[in-house]
Regions:
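Extended, charged alpha-beta segments that form solvent-exposed binding/catalytic grooves
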Residues: 2-200
Length: 200
């Protein structure tokens, strides 16, 4: 099929930077990997949730006030309501919203898992993807080390079930990092660059 522009010439259908097509062979491997990970998390007693890709920006900000929405979220104006919408950049704020609104009276702990696309605004791509597929889990209502141990053990189980053998698990605490920069005036872009450098 030839796609022509309005002058009869060939149209270059290039994707935006930071996104890619997943073609059949890779897509088949991806589907099988996703299935393996989801079955493993379900085996640990976690239940699936599937939040929407688009949410009201203020709802995400309220669900997780410390989340760096200015750097991470793609935003748009809803033509129906005039309110600001955000594309999902991470599942954690959405699961915080779900727990606060749909499970406020539920017995703790809550165990949820999720998977799906996320779209992130990355100030400097440097070969990074803007559209990713994320799978993960949240254990809510367990504040002691046993909760951390459970989620780490489940993650290791997922990696092994996926066929990985040679991997390393790094455990950190984001509050330490936030405390260091609490009194330093940085733009969201500068803070993102520093955070990204530390991760690497």
């Amino acid at each position: 099929m030839n796609i022509l522009n309005d002058k009869g010439g060939r149209l270059h259908l290039e994707l935006p930077a930071g996104v890619a097509d997943i073609l059949p062979e890779a897509a088949e491997r991806f589907i099988e990997l996703r299935r393996t990970i989801l079955i493993t998390m379900a085996g640990w007693g976690y239940r699936p949730v599937q939040p929407p890709l688009i949410e009201h920006a203020e709802a995400l900000a309220r669900a997780l006030p410390d989340y760096d929405e200015e750097v991470s979220f793609y935003k748009m104006v809803d033509r129906l309501s005039g309110r600001v919408l955000s594309l999902r950049a991470d599942f954690t704020p959405q699961l915080a919203r779900i727990a606060a609104t749909r499970f406020a009276e539920a017995a703790l702990p809550l165990r949820f898992f999720y998977e799906g696309p996320v779209v992130r605004h990355v100030p400097n791509l440097n070969g990074k993807r803007r559209e990713l597929h994320q799978a993960g889990a949240e254990l809510m209502g367990v504040m002691d080390p046993e909760g951390d141990s459970e989620t780490i053990a489940m993650m290791v189980d997922c990696l092994r079930a996926s066929g990985l053998e040679d991997f390393k698990v790094d455990v950190g605490q984001v509050e330490f990092f936030k405390g260091i920069f609490k009194d330093v005036e940085l733009t969201p872009e500068a803070l993102y660059a520093i955070t990204d450098a530390v991760k690497r």
